[in-house]
């Protein structure tokens, strides 16, 4: 039995990196933008979900960790504390 070729998930175009498109760098003080890249549990979303480039994903992770350290972002959501 052979598998037919057209039965997989449809491929979508790669999403363009928001930071590169806007010409900005992730900043720990921009809490509203950083929250878009966190799950409800407070975890950092992976690149495959956000479409951010590898370079900006590393900078984003550092910015989120800095914001957490300075208590601008919660380390854990309120319902788990």
Curated annotation (Swiss-Prot):
SUPFAM superfamilies tied to this protein: Ribosomal protein S18 (SSF46911)
Intrachain disulfide bonds: none
GO MF annotation list: small ribosomal subunit rRNA binding; structural constituent of ribosome
Keywords: Ribonucleoprotein, Ribosomal protein, RNA-binding, rRNA-binding
GO cellular component, one term: cytosolic small ribosomal subunit
InterPro entries cross-referenced by the UniProt entry: Ribosomal_bS18, Ribosomal_bS18_sf
Gene3D superfamilies: Ribosomal protein S18
GO biological process, one term: translation
UniProt entry tagged with the keyword Ribonucleoprotein: yes
Family of this protein: Belongs to the bacterial ribosomal protein bS18 family.
Known role: Binds as a heterodimer with protein bS6 to the central domain of the 16S rRNA, where it helps stabilize the platform of the 30S subunit.
Subunit-structure text: Part of the 30S ribosomal subunit. Forms a tight heterodimer with protein bS6.
Protein name, UniProt field: Small ribosomal subunit protein bS18
Native organism taxonomy: Bacteria, Bacillati, Chloroflexota, Chloroflexia, Chloroflexales
Gene behind the chain: rpsR
């Amino acid at each position: 039995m052979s598998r037919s070729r057209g039965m997989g998930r449809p491929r979508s175009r790669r999403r363009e990196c928001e930071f590169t498109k806007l010409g900005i760098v992730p900043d720990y003080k921009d809490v509203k933008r950083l929250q878009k890249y966190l799950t409800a549990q407070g975890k950092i979303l992976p690149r495959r979900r956000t479409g951010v480039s590898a370079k900006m994903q590393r900078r984003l992770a550092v910015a989120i960790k800095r914001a957490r350290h300075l208590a601008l972002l919660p380390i854990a959501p309120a319902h788990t504390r």
